[in-house]
């Protein structure tokens, strides 16, 4: 845990001279990683599930708004399922998190992002599975006619690939470990739709229950991206690794040491603080998506005979 910008975020986005030396020393490993990722994706067996599958993905590791994007577009349709890996969950294998808004498992079993999706998508079913094809098959079994695939670009499915592109890219366009990309940056050209922040969508934030002295607590990737949305009432920032569980005793200690009046958390972090007795303020993030993007997704969904306008 750090209260300033984490080491890895500096390494990938604003490296020091020493870090740049390390980056170029590791570059041969990045080339190997890139080749393996590309070969694995392009030689994988093709799956066609005969229903529209919309993959909301990104090329960089870590957060880029995939979950808020799905939260924004999935409610526009009926008979929908969301299939995700379920990062940092306590469970293994396929788990049905919710069926049409009826939540079946606790947050730790689902993972924070999948649980957040289940809480907010009342008309959708949410499924987690390391093997996404099993998740899609379960969605079909549940009667879903549209599937949103969280982070599915690397899977060789017959799907509509939408890639989110951040406003601020990593410092170097390299793959891991020298850069933050999981695929060659040229893979943007393979997407059906590239959705660029501040061009094709805008982030809109609000704070529920703001107080005079808020202690920011978050476990998201690249947490300094929140800085642009933080009010002056934030007295300190506590950063944890992405998806990390929170130590409630540590939070209580920091809360009183900083004379805080509430913890400021994101909606994603909030699902892990259901047992927290401290006052909570919530930084709500929503996306305003360009109509042309929505029209492209509509066009793909309507190309399947099982989806007519009355079902949208």
Swiss-Prot record:
It catalyses: a lipid A disaccharide + ATP = a lipid IVA + ADP + H(+). InterPro entries: LpxK (IPR003758). GO terms for molecular function: ATP binding; tetraacyldisaccharide 4'-kinase activity. Keywords: ATP-binding, Kinase, Lipid A biosynthesis, Lipid biosynthesis, Lipid metabolism, Nucleotide-binding, Transferase. ATP binds at residues 60-67. Transfers the gamma-phosphate of ATP to the 4'-position of a tetraacyldisaccharide 1-phosphate intermediate (termed DS-1-P) to form tetraacyldisaccharide 1,4'-bis-phosphate (lipid IVA). This is Tetraacyldisaccharide 4'-kinase. It comes from Helicobacter pylori (strain J99 / ATCC 700824) (Campylobacter pylori J99).
């Amino acid at each position: 845990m750090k209260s300033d910008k984490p080491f890895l975020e500096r390494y990938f986005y604003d490296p020091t001279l020493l870090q740049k030396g390390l980056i170029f020393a590791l570059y041969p490993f990045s080339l190997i990683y890139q080749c393996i990722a590309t070969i694995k994706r392009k030689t994988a067996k093709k799956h066609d599930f005969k229903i529209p599958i919309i993959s909301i993905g990104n090329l960089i590791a870590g957060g880029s708004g995939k979950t808020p994007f799905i939260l924004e577009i999935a409610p526009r349709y009926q008979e929908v399922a969301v299939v995700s890996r379920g990062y940092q969950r306590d469970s293994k294998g396929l788990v049905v998190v919710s069926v049409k808004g009826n939540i079946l498992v606790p947050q730790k079993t689902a993972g924070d992002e999948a649980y957040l999706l289940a809480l907010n998508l009342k008309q959708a079913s949410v499924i987690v599975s390391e093997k996404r094809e099993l998740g899609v098959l379960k969605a079909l079994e549940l009667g879903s006619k549209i599937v949103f695939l969280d982070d599915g670009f690397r899977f060789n499915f017959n799907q509509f690939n939408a890639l989110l592109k951040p406003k601020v890219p990593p410092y170097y366009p390299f793959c891991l470990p020298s850069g933050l990309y999981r695929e060659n940056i040229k893979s943007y050209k393979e997407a059906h739709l590239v959705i660029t922040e501040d061009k094709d969508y805008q982030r809109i934030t609000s704070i529920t229950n703001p107080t005079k002295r808020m202690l920011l607590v978050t476990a998201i990737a690249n947490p300094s991206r929140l800085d642009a949305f933080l009010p002056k009432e934030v007295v300190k920032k506590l950063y944890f690794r992405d998806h990390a569980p929170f130590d409630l005793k540590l939070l209580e200690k920091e809360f009183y040491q900083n004379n805080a009046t509430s913890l400021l958390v994101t909606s994603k972090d909030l699902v892990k603080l259901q047992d927290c007795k401290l006052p909570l303020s919530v930084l709500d993030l929503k996306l305003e998506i360009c109509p042309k993007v929505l029209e492209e997704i509509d066009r793909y969904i309507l190309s399947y005979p099982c989806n007519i306008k009355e079902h949208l």
